[in-house]
Each structure stands twice: as C-alpha cells, then as structure tokens.
Amino acid sequence: MKKYFSLLFFATTLALPAAAQQDPKAGKILDQMSAKYQALKAFQATFTQTLENPSAKVKQNISGDILVSGQKFRLKISGQEVINDGKTTWTYLKNENEVNISDSDPDAQEMSPSQIYTMYKKGYKYNYVQQVTEGGEALDVIELAPENRQNDVFKVRLKVREKDASVKSWQMFKKNGNQYTFLIKNFKPNPPTDAGTFTFDKAKYKGVKVVDLR
C-alpha cells in the first residue's frame, strides 16, 4: 500500500507528553485560533504543500483539497483520495484504480488533519516569535517544539492572521533536513455535508480493486 500523504501523519509525529511552562502571549493566540476552528461544523480548503531540503537541493510542490468535520475528513491530492469517517479509512489510488481499507487508529491520530488546531495543548513548548506582514496581512508567528527530543520533528512554525485568528500556513522541520510547508488557500467554513461525504462509494469507481487490510 502506498504511504499516506505527510499531512496525515503530521499529528502522529507529534503525539507527545504533557506540556511545560508556556509563553502566555503565544498561548492566547493559539487558544483563539483553536476556538475559531472548533466552533465550525465543517470546513473546506485548498492548500499547497512544499517539501524542501536545502542540503539535498530538493524543492517539490503539490496541491490538494481537504474537507474536514470533527475527526472525519476527505482529502484529494496527487492521484490519491483519502476518506475517513472516524472509524475506517479508505485510500483510493487513481492510477491503480485500487482502494485500500484500514481501521483508523485513535491512538496514533494520524488520520486527523484537524489536529493542527489543537495539538499545541499537549506535549509542546510554544513561543511567540514575531509579527510579520505578508501580502498586506499582519501575521503572528508562533513556534512549537516537542518535549520529546526523540521526535523526528524538532520544530513547527505557525503563521496566524491577526485580524481573525485563522491559520495562513504551518511549517514542519524534521531532523533529516526536510521542511514541509502547508499554505492554506480558499478556506470555506461550514460547507454542506451529508451521510455519504465521509465514506467510500464503490459504485462511483467502476472496476475498482478493493484491498481490505483490516
């Protein structure tokens, strides 16, 4: 089975112990940001992911679309469609016309893109860095560091809009030199969803091969 998109294991790599002393200014901004997103029934956004490794002279960009409702989501990116209803995950591989079915792992939390809005509450030290202006927008820059030093990720940098506490981007720094930047675009709050939004409908994928890994 093909590996999951890095956005999906983002929360997994940062599942850590309880947090210590924190920066109150950063904490206030993060709380406002978290409350904003948790108040939504659902949200949809397009995004761009950039993978950079300066030492290896690597820079790659891919774009995608995601729809999230609580712990449920539907992600389309780079020939893959990943659907999660909170219990089951379907990963559809377009080129192979194949869908892999697996159980969601509530402990790993790897299938919860919404974790970006709550992850700071446990296992991180966070610090207010500065305010910057990009494209005429004032952005508060906050850095989070995992307390578990064995973690592959050593830093996460969030950029939060001052005007409405929405997230513009986040950047993940890994020990192997890889840097992942996620830039949120075309954010839509509370899009319509129904019972079938977060399930895989085999009838819509003619001739699909089903691989049940449960």
What residue spans do the PLM features occupy?
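An acidic-aromatic
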Residues: 63-111, 180-181
